[in-house]
């Protein structure tokens, strides 16, 4: 792909991400992205082949953002447990930064869109490999680091998913978790810490 074409492709993806953030998944159409970018629908079709191609590329871009977050974490310290908890907290902030982006990554909010299986496998493998590396440092020798990482991730995903779900609805007047950032962060931290302890993760 020529540099100009690559630049235009990236511009459309940047625009699509902005549309996703500002207007939600319903606005992720070829026409909607083209109008937001000040371009023709033909130019979007020429680079992505249609809405499915655009959504596949955007799906890949969202995982690129998560990969960049994981790669940008501070270097490993002697306290691998603290490092892993820090990763988990950053993951929560990533999800909260844009619930619609997070939904595009892990749910199916766009009717009729299911990411290409090969693409889905590639992006998940890349990001999960970075996560496994952090878990490996504190994983018991007898445990499988991949399985342990998956179990920890499901806890992280479940906790933040429940938080996002509750945040999108009218607060329950008698719910035991106050609808505050401090309370939600504390609940998430405690849940992740309990899971890490249960998995036997420790500094070796």
Segments and roles (model prediction):
Residues 8-16, 33, 58-62, 66, ...:
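Generic hydrophobic, amphipathic alpha-helix propensity
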Residues 20, 55-62, 105, 120, ...:
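Alpha-helical DNA-contacting segments of helix-turn-helix folds
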Residues 57, 71-101, 124-126, 142-152:
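Hydrophobic alpha-helical connector segments
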Residues 93, 97-130, 174-181:
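Short secondary-structure transition hinges
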Residues 1-7, 18, 77, 171, ...:
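N-terminal intrinsically disordered/low-complexity leader segments
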Residues 70, 114-139, 146-150, 182-196:
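Amphipathic alpha-helical packing segments from all-alpha helical-bundle domains
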Residues 133, 153-175, 194-203:
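Amphipathic C-terminal alpha-helical segment
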Residues 11, 19-53, 57:
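Helix-turn-helix
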């Amino acid at each position: 792909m020529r540099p100009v074409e690559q630049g235009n492709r990236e511009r459309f993806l940047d625009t699509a991400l902005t549309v996703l953030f500002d207007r939600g998944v319903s606005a992720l159409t070829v026409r909607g992205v083209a109008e937001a970018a000040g371009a023709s629908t033909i130019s979007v079709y020429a680079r992505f082949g249609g809405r499915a191609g655009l959504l596949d590329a955007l799906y890949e871009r969202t995982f690129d953002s998560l990969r960049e977050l994981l790669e940008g974490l501070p270097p490993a310290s002697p306290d691998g447990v603290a490092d892993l908890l820090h990763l988990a907290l950053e993951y929560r902030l990533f999800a909260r930064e844009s619930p619609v982006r997070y939904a595009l990554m892990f749910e199916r909010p766009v009717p009729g869109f299911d990411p290409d299986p090969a693409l889905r496998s590639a992006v998940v493998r890349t990001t999960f490999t970075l996560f496994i590396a952090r878990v490996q440092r504190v994983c018991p020798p007898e445990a499988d680091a991949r399985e342990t990482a998956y179990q920890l991730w499901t806890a992280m995903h479940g906790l933040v998913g429940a938080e996002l779900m509750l945040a999108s609805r009218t607060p329950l007047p008698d719910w035991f978790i106050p609808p505050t950032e401090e309370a939600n962060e504390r609940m998430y931290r405690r849940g992740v810490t309990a899971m890490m302890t249960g998995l036997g993760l420790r500094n070796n």
